[in-house]
Amino acid sequence: MRPHGRARDAMREIKLEAGVSVYAEGSCLARFGGTHVLCTASIEESVPPWMRGGGKGWVTAEYGMLPRATHTRSRREATAGKQSGRTQEIQRLIGRSLRAVVDLKALGERQITIDCDVLQADGGTRTAAITGAWVALKQATGYLIEEGLLTSDPVHGQLAAISCGVIDGETRLDLEYEEDRRAEADANFVLTDTGGIVEIQATAEDKPIPETDFDLLFALAKAGVVDLCEAQLAALKG
């Protein structure tokens, strides 16, 4: 039995709220059940030094968790003086995923930074961050068009992300923390609305994942991403 009685192919309650920040050019509060991630998009009219003069823009991301986003308080990484390997891995994943659906040349020599701050964590923070980040990015490029700084949208595709796993021999969609911590295998899928693969991270804990189980996880993820993409568009429409 899954927590809250969910079916194996059921996601948690998904809520995506766009435009939650009065200052950022784009923003989205992504709620995947008990996981809440605030994503904000900020536009800078410059690019990193190594990109100057190249005629292309850049999309990057930063990720972090509030100290009490989890059951016990975690020390702020700024206080520790360095980011954890996990933080660096996740923010690179977010940026890399978003760049897969952006025409950087069409963006022009400007940078969009997506800040993903985990307010509350109950599993799937990176997938919630990617899903909310796309909404914030779309709002930001919409702002550039409204301001006359762009004539067309450089975001040429839609994507979202979801977690899956094998628990007690059963393949399940959208794991929460209690499931994730005892999963025999878990995977994160970043997919486009048309089923294109942007990134897949899959790990076996006790024994290798049979191909049949992976195929089941992939099928669950594809169905979940379709629903997430619909939620993204609904959020942008307000």
UniProtKB/Swiss-Prot annotation:
<dbReference type="InterPro" id="IPR050080">
    <property type="entry name" value="RNase_PH"/>
</dbReference>
<dbReference type="GO" id="GO:0000049">
    <property type="term" value="F:tRNA binding"/>
</dbReference>
<dbReference type="InterPro" id="IPR002381">
    <property type="entry name" value="RNase_PH_bac-type"/>
</dbReference>
<keyword id="KW-0820">tRNA-binding</keyword>
<dbReference type="Pfam" id="PF01138">
    <property type="entry name" value="RNase_PH"/>
</dbReference>
<dbReference type="GO" id="GO:0009022">
    <property type="term" value="F:tRNA nucleotidyltransferase activity"/>
</dbReference>
<comment type="function">
    <text>Phosphorolytic 3'-5' exoribonuclease that plays an important role in tRNA 3'-end maturation. Removes nucleotide residues following the 3'-CCA terminus of tRNAs; can also add nucleotides to the ends of RNA molecules by using nucleoside diphosphates as substrates, but this may not be physiologically important. Probably plays a role in initiation of 16S rRNA degradation (leading to ribosome degradation) during starvation.</text>
</comment>
<dbReference type="InterPro" id="IPR018336">
    <property type="entry name" value="RNase_PH_CS"/>
</dbReference>
<dbReference type="InterPro" id="IPR027408">
    <property type="entry name" value="PNPase/RNase_PH_dom_sf"/>
</dbReference>
<feature type="binding site">
    <location>
        <begin position="124"/>
        <end position="126"/>
    </location>
    <ligand>
        <name>phosphate</name>
    </ligand>
</feature>
<dbReference type="InterPro" id="IPR001247">
    <property type="entry name" value="ExoRNase_PH_dom1"/>
</dbReference>
<dbReference type="InterPro" id="IPR036345">
    <property type="entry name" value="ExoRNase_PH_dom2_sf"/>
</dbReference>
<comment type="subunit">
    <text>Homohexameric ring arranged as a trimer of dimers.</text>
</comment>
<keyword id="KW-0694">RNA-binding</keyword>
<protein>
    <recommendedName>
        <fullName>Ribonuclease PH</fullName>
        <ecNumber>2.7.7.56</ecNumber>
    </recommendedName>
</protein>
<keyword id="KW-0819">tRNA processing</keyword>
<feature type="binding site">
    <location>
        <position position="86"/>
    </location>
    <ligand>
        <name>phosphate</name>
    </ligand>
</feature>
<dbReference type="Pfam" id="PF03725">
    <property type="entry name" value="RNase_PH_C"/>
</dbReference>
<dbReference type="GO" id="GO:0016075">
    <property type="term" value="P:rRNA catabolic process"/>
</dbReference>
<keyword id="KW-0808">Transferase</keyword>
<comment type="similarity">
    <text>Belongs to the RNase PH family.</text>
</comment>
<keyword id="KW-0548">Nucleotidyltransferase</keyword>
<dbReference type="InterPro" id="IPR020568">
    <property type="entry name" value="Ribosomal_Su5_D2-typ_SF"/>
</dbReference>
<dbReference type="GO" id="GO:0006364">
    <property type="term" value="P:rRNA processing"/>
</dbReference>
<keyword id="KW-0698">rRNA processing</keyword>
<dbReference type="InterPro" id="IPR015847">
    <property type="entry name" value="ExoRNase_PH_dom2"/>
</dbReference>
<dbReference type="GO" id="GO:0008033">
    <property type="term" value="P:tRNA processing"/>
</dbReference>
<dbReference type="GO" id="GO:0000175">
    <property type="term" value="F:3'-5'-RNA exonuclease activity"/>
</dbReference>
